[in-house]
Swiss-Prot record:
The longin domain is essential for the vacuolar and subcellular targeting. The chain crosses the membrane at residues 190-210. The gene is VAMP711. SMART domains: Longin (SM01270). It comes from Arabidopsis thaliana. Residues 211-219 are vesicular. Residues 7-111 form the Longin domain. This is Vesicle-associated membrane protein 711. Residues 126-186 form the v-SNARE coiled-coil homology domain. It is a single-pass type IV membrane protein.
């Protein structure tokens, strides 16, 4: 049997426990309860000879089990998570005010059943492995979604840049048309000035040949 002992406690107050072996597991477990930090949630393991005490503390409620060293960590902690959920679901807020062993008569049977299940039923490890794979897939999905969102942001940024480029192109064309118009008008003015200058030069030359500005010799 992989799991041999289990308890549920609030701080150092044991609310329910069950043992499947004649050892001093209960004594050691209560000593461990005094060492577990009282403020933070934690998952820890303590080695004792060929046994390991696994402890899960969540929201002030501590679930502990003693398992054979060969059981590893996955099955014991899956057991602790299962027990924690069952206990909270069954007793709710009563766990915060219950006296020592107040739930033992009823819940010790649940501990016994779940110890037997997680120790002997091959489906227990299979289900835990599937849960682990599902969590891994969920993590990959979240990662992929994050990447898609990141690509979406880059796409949105690219669209914004394209819109800016189009706006710049429109402004450039407008400025180019205005520049061409200004150049054309300058050319027209310059042409008119050149024609007028040429006419003045011709007039001066003719006036010189015709002996006066009124052109008396040529009229």
């Amino acid at each position: 049997m992989a799991i041999l002992y289990a308890l549920v406690a609030r701080g150092t107050v044991v609310l329910s426990e069950f043992t499947a072996t004649s050892t001093n597991a209960s004594t050691i477990a209560k000593q461990i309860l005094e060492k577990v930090p009282g403020d933070n949630d934690s998952n820890v393991s303590y080695s004792q000879d060929r046994y390991v005490f696994h402890v899960k503390r969540t929201d002030g409620l501590t679930v502990l089990c003693m398992a054979e060293e060969t059981a590893g960590r996955r099955i014991p902690f899956a057991f602790l998570e299962d027990i924690h959920q069952r206990f909270v679901r069954t007793y709710g807020r009563a766990v915060h005010t219950a006296l020592a062993y107040a739930m033992n008569e009823e819940f010790s049977r649940v501990l016994s059943q779940q110890i037997d299940y997680y120790s002997n039923d091959p489906n227990a490890d299979r289900i835990n492995r599937i849960k682990g794979e599902m969590n891994q897939v969920r993590g990959v999905m979240i990662e992929n979604i994050d990447k898609v969102l990141d690509r979406g942001e880059r796409l949105e940024l690219l669209v914004d840049k394209t819109a800016n480029m189009q706006g710049n192109t429109f402004r450039f064309r407008k400025q180019a048309r205005r520049f061409r118009s200004n150049v054309w008008w300058r050319n027209c003015k310059l042409t008119v000035l050149l024609i007028l200058l040429l006419l003045v030069i011709i007039y001066i030359a003719v006036a010189f040949l015709c002996h006066g500005p009124t052109l008396p010799s040529c009229i």
